[in-house]
UniProtKB/Swiss-Prot annotation:
The gene is cfp. It comes from Neurospora crassa (strain ATCC 24698 / 74-OR23-1A / CBS 708.71 / DSM 1257 / FGSC 987). Belongs to the TPP enzyme family. Pathway: Carbohydrate metabolism; pyruvate metabolism. PANTHER family: PYRUVATE DECARBOXYLASE (PTHR43452), PYRUVATE DECARBOXYLASE C186.09-RELATED (PTHR43452:SF1). This is Pyruvate decarboxylase. InterPro entries: DHS-like_NAD/FAD-binding_dom, PDC/IPDC-like, THDP-binding, Thiamin_PyroP_enz_cen_dom, Thiamin_PyroP_enz_TPP-bd_dom, TPP-bd_CS, TPP_enzyme_TPP-bd, TPP_PDC_IPDC. Substrate binds at residues 33, 120, 477.
Length: 570
């Protein structure tokens, strides 16, 4: 009887069961003839729901957003024409430390040995190229050669993704998805975490406490990896034990409570908020918890802290004169919290430097809409049930300046920086968190890259509010390096929603040219639960934040640096 049951169990069934066991509830797909049998197997699993996407780029970005909400996601595409497009969102998941399982169908196992030239390929019989490419953008890539190998390879890839907080790649030939294999063993073999080495953890905490005892003005800088490591609770515990000022990198907004008395703002060099920049430069030591220093977060390398750094990463700790491997962030912060000496010198200084709250002008109803008025009205929308997505561009700066109430979530893609990311990512996120109000701030140029996924929001009746700021161009590129290529064709965005509705959709597209029209549109959006609401907010092309102008200037200068050690002939 057991043998008979196992004979009915297939590679596709194995993958479906493992995905369900690790917590996947929705899998994002674009069908193609190399993955159709596999899709049938995934569809048949009672705990998995298939979510079709408009294209493979959007599919991968929707899975990226889902991983933000769920901790792990799955994207299923066809060979080459599908996977190569999905590599973009997979790259985002790698850069942003998100476990995304990219699954691709592939040619029949008989074709390579017979030197067949197949469709959807490069036109030669070597079909390893996609697998080789996937190795560069995942923590683990596997190509299943035989059904008997599937359990071992699938388990290897999933465990690697979960432990590394990075994407993995699983390639399944079209004739193996329905081939028989054994049933899976206990899921703990995949999901059991690797804990800190006890000796390394104790030594790291002891040395770190001694190191910090010698500092007069320490400050904590929180980066995006703190959230990916799930260390928010331990971070608060450690910060309160230290008593010092806590600043956040822009990509870490929302990972430390903004109403906490030790929160001093966003550290972003010349475009920092509150007094964060002054506090960082006044400090004599910085504890970097999950920090990422790249050209964007350092404003073109002009805002790299010039003080000793203690780096607390997801699995190791480094500070001047010491390095400790296999030390998990959560455990280290908890251990260190019990050993540090309370030192609130930076908070005393912050109280002296803390700026007064800025005056916020409330526009009259008939006033033309402006960027500041949009931000003011969005601020009033934020609650403890809000998840705010900000796309690459001025939406970054507008979103960073908003005050998050306790419980509100903030999502940004600053390492990968893909314009248009927010539309499919918010869709994927909202499917996993239907209890939250997902709001998107996106520019018109970014929206045009991934606009098709609004149709899936309509299809699945996802009540996302899209605040589309229409200033007729790629404003962020204008500030970095202007040119005619930054001009785009204007769309009637509000009317576009009607095309997505067709005869059975319930999305709403609204146009706001004035402050009053925006206020009215927001009321409609907040009461509409049968699909997305897109509010096209028209503003002047030159109406952008001064922070974007400043930041763009420095990033442009960094991009324009001449090659090193190159002689220049007159």
């Amino acid at each position: 009887m057991v043998a008979q049951q196992q004979g009915k169990f297939t590679v596709g069934d194995y993958l479906a069961e493992r995905l369900a066991q690790v917590g996947v509830r929705h899998h994002f797909v674009v069908p193609g003839d190399y993955n159709l049998i596999l899709l049938d197997k995934l569809q048949a699993h009672p705990d998995l729901k298939e979510v079709g996407c408009a294209n493979e780029l959007n599919c991968s970005l929707a899975a990226e957003g889902y991983a933000r909400a769920n901790g792990i996601s799955a994207c299923v595409v066809t060979y080459s024409v599908g996977a190569l497009s999905a590599f973009n969102g997979t790259g985002s998941a790698y850069a942003e430390n998100l476990p995304l399982v990219l699954i691709s169908g592939s040619p029949n196992t008989n074709d390579p040995s017979q030197y067949h030239i197949l469709h959807h390929t490069l036109g030669h019989p070597d079909y390893t190229y996609q697998y080789e490419m996937a190795k560069k953008i995942t923590c683990c890539a596997v190509a299943i050669p035989r059904a008997i190998d599937a359990p071992r390879l699938i388990d290897r890839a999933l465990r690697a993704a979960i432990l590394a907080r990075k994407p993995c790649y699983i390639e399944i030939p079209t004739n193996l998805a329905g081939a028989t294999c054994v049933r899976p063993g206990p899921i703990s073999a995949i999901t059991d975490p690797i804990t800190s080495d006890k000796s390394a953890l104790e030594a790291a905490a002891k040395c770190a406490a001694e190191y910090l005892d010698g500092k007069l003005k320490p400050v904590i800088l929180v980066g995006p990896k703190a959230g990916r490591a799930g260390s928010e609770k331990e971070l608060i515990e450690f910060a309160e034990a230290m008593g010092c000022a806590v600043a956040l990198q822009p990509a870490a907004k929302g990972m430390f409570p903004e109403d906490h008395k030790q929160f001093v703002g966003i550290f972003w060099g010349q475009v920092s908020s509150d007094a964060a920049d002054a506090m960082v430069h006044w400090a004599d030591a910085m504890i970097c918890v999950g920090a990422v220093f790249n050209d964007y977060s350092t404003v073109g390398w002009t805002a790299v802290p010039n003080i000793p750094l203690m780096t607390v990463d997801m699995d190791h700790v480094t500070f001047p004169g010491a390095h400790f491997s296999r030390v998990r962030m959560c455990e280290f912060l908890s251990h260190l919290a019990t050993q540090v000496t309370f030192n609130d010198s930076t908070m005393i200084e912050y109280k002296r430097l803390k700026p007064d709250p800025p005056h916020v002008h409330t526009a009259e109803r008939e006033e033309p809409l402006s960027r500041k008025e949009i931000s003011r009205q969005v601020q009033e929308m934020l609650t403890d049930k809000t998840s705010l997505f900000v796309d690459t561009g001025d939406s970054w700066f507008n979103g960073i300046q908003l005050k998050l109430p306790p419980g509100a979530k903030f999502e940004i893609e600053m390492q990968w920086g893909h314009i248009g990311w927010s539309i499919p990512a918010a869709f994927g996120y909202a499917l996993r968190h239907p209890d939250r109000h997902t709001i998107v701030l996106v520019g018109d140029g970014s929206f045009q890259v991934t606009a098709q996924e609004v149709s899936q929001m309509v299809r699945f009746k996802v009540p996302i509010t899209i605040m589309l700021i229409n200033n007729r161009g790629y404003t962020i590129e204008v500030e970095i390096h202007d040119g005619s290529y930054n001009k785009i064709k204007n769309w009637d965005y509000a009317m576009l929603v009607e095309a997505f509705n067709s005869t059975d959709g319930h999305a709403k597209g609204l146009l706001a040219n004035t402050a009053g029209e925006l206020a009215d549109a927001i009321k409609v959006a907040e009461s509409h639960k049968e699909g997305p609401t897109l509010i096209e907010c028209t503003i002047d092309q030159d109406d952008c934040s001064k922070e974007l102008i400043t930041w763009g200037h420095y990033v442009a200068a960094a991009n324009a640096r001449p090659p090193r050690n190159m002689s220049v002939q007159e």
